[in-house]
Amino acid sequence: MDNFLALTLSGTTPRVTQGKGAGFRWRWLGHGLLELTPDAPVDRALILSAGIHGNETAPVEMLDRLLSALFSGSLTLTWRVLVVLGNPQALTAGIRYGHSDMNRMFGGRWQSFAESDETRRARELELSLETFFSSGQARVRWHLDLHTAIRGSHHLRFGVLPQRDRPWETDFLAWLGAAGLEALVFHQAPGGTFTHFSSEHFGALSCTLELGKALPFGQNDLTQFNVTSQALSALLSGVETSTSFSPPLRYRVVSQITRHSDKFALYMDAQTLNFTAFAKGTLLAEEGDKRVTVTHDVEYVLFPNPSVACGLRAGLMLERLP
């Protein structure tokens, strides 16, 4: 199985759907779904996902390289792994999504969207995770969902962590720092993301990794993400990652800007970078007689997008943690 990405993009089912790799067994579970199980017993399970948005190709290329290293035997596997290419049809078309944003649909929220390829795929991925986690006895469960951002950022690489009732484990946060993430953003409320689903339903330590900016296949400079690729390789093979890194800055979400109607106006232009700072009192958005302003001394914007569909998030506002 050295052509997982090509088969997924072409919509082709391989003639052989299971086999042996270098120290592990593999199973093709469907388009964009590949399970890897080490020959030796392990108590760690990992979801490695990318391509939830079809125009975010750099992480897909990174995963393809990791798979090549595993199948060539140059990289040892010490986790049970489910590799997920989230939205194959959008990846093939080179578009973010066909009908609706899948990363708003998880946790059963797909039922409130008009039926589409994305709603069907979200349901399929939920079932795939349920099967994967229920078929093993993993003591450790991680989910790393790799993305790229629509716009530029003051932090080239950053992580977004779902709301969680328990404290985050130190070794997980340390690995995120070793993977080159410059900032970590902590959600304070539930959401429809893939990582919130895996965290809430299966107790996984989950993070959305935002790596650079969305570009078409073949146009990505993957050298920007060498530190992340090296950390992923070390993780898969059970090697300790470097401890000589600057701890990521930490932010928490303090509010969400939502577009409710065509009267919505977001006062940020296309050049506004993620993590741009705004002073207290700054007018951020208006909709009819409703005004959204900065309420803390300083707030930072994340994922500003004035053109989202009505009812969806047009941006998050953050505050920096000590």
From Swiss-Prot:
Enzyme Commission number: 3.5.1.96
Keyword entries, A-Z: Arginine metabolism, Hydrolase, Metal-binding, Zinc
SUPFAM superfamilies: Zn-dependent exopeptidases
Xref: Pfam families: AstE_AspA_cat, AstE_AspA_hybrid
Cofactor comment: Binds 1 zinc ion per subunit.
Superkingdom to which the source organism belongs: Bacteria
Record carries keyword Metal-binding: yes
Residues engaged in binding Zn(2+): H53, E56, H147
Disulfide bridge partners, by residue number: none
CDD domains (UniProt xref): M14_ASTE (cd03855)
Catalytic activity: N-succinyl-L-glutamate + H2O = L-glutamate + succinate
InterPro entries in UniProt: AspA/AstE_fam, AstE_AspA_cat, Aste_AspA_hybrid_dom, SuccinylGlu_desuccinylase
Co-factor requirement: Zn(2+)
Pathway given in the UniProt record: Amino-acid degradation; L-arginine degradation via AST pathway; L-glutamate and succinate from L-arginine: step 5/5
The keyword Ligase is annotated on this UniProt entry: no
GO process annotations (BP): arginine catabolic process to glutamate; arginine catabolic process to succinate
Active site: E210
Any one GO molecular function term: hydrolase activity, acting on ester bonds
Function: Transforms N(2)-succinylglutamate into succinate and glutamate.
Family: Belongs to the AspA/AstE family. Succinylglutamate desuccinylase subfamily.
Family annotation (PANTHER family): ASPARTOACYLASE (PTHR15162), SUCCINYLGLUTAMATE DESUCCINYLASE (PTHR15162:SF7)
UniProt protein name: Succinylglutamate desuccinylase
